[in-house]
Swiss-Prot record:
Part of the 30S ribosomal subunit. Contacts proteins S4 and S8. The keyword Ribonucleoprotein applies. The keyword rRNA-binding applies. This is Small ribosomal subunit protein uS5. The lineage of its organism: Bacteria, Pseudomonadati, Pseudomonadota, Gammaproteobacteria, Enterobacterales. With S4 and S12 plays an important role in translational accuracy. Located at the back of the 30S subunit body where it stabilizes the conformation of the head with respect to the body. GO terms for molecular function: rRNA binding; structural constituent of ribosome. Residues 11-74 form the S5 DRBM domain. Belongs to the universal ribosomal protein uS5 family. It comes from Cronobacter sakazakii (strain ATCC BAA-894).
Length: 166
């Protein structure tokens, strides 16, 4: 599993996985490459992309472009999560919970890359079930997208933020 990090303007880009895939035809096999990347601004915006091409650099480029187009906003709370969240995609399930200052990102592989570029600095996370990088990334982003800030919950319930936080 390759990890490449670049700064593109204000966006952090990370390469999570490159995979060689083949198509069998009458004359033999045709090989191509897939790339899984995540991009984020380190301040709550994150997206992932999956690109496929005959050459590795082209696959990475396609994945980066798709990641930039598919970004979501995540409501962070001083570098950690608002509350414990679960995310799922196909066979992968992830659980993430906020952690105190100085804990760091305790997460594995693909989940760590997503959390780093999203701007999360302290989190405890665990992946269950399938650890296929694509599914783990999708499950992580699903969990982050489902996280609600106290302001959002208060607005939905028609209460003040103080009432929500107790």
């Amino acid at each position: 599993m390759a990890h490449i990090e670049k700064q593109a303007g204000e966006l952090q880009e990370k390469l999570i996985a490159v995979n060689r895939v083949s198509k069998t035809v009458k004359g033999g096999r045709i090989f191509s490459f897939t790339a899984l990347t995540v991009v984020g601004d380190g301040n709550g915006r994150v997206g992932f992309g999956y690109g496929k091409a005959r050459e590795v650099p082209a696959a990475i480029q396609k994945a980066m472009e798709k990641a930039r187009r598919n970004m979501i906003n995540v409501a962070l709370n001083h570098g950690t999560l608002q509350h414990p969240v679960k995310g799922a995609h196909t066979g992968s399930r992830v659980f993430m919970q906020p952690a105190s200052e100085g804990t760091g990102i305790i997460a594995g592989g693909a989940m760590r890359a997503v959390l780093e570029v999203a701007g999360v600095h302290n989190v405890l996370a665990k992946a269950y079930g399938s650890t296929n990088p694509i599914n783990v990334v999708r499950a992580t982003i699903d969990g982050l997208a489902n996280m609600k800030s106290p302001e959002m919950v208060a607005a939905k319930r028609g209460k003040s933020v103080e009432e929500i936080l107790g």
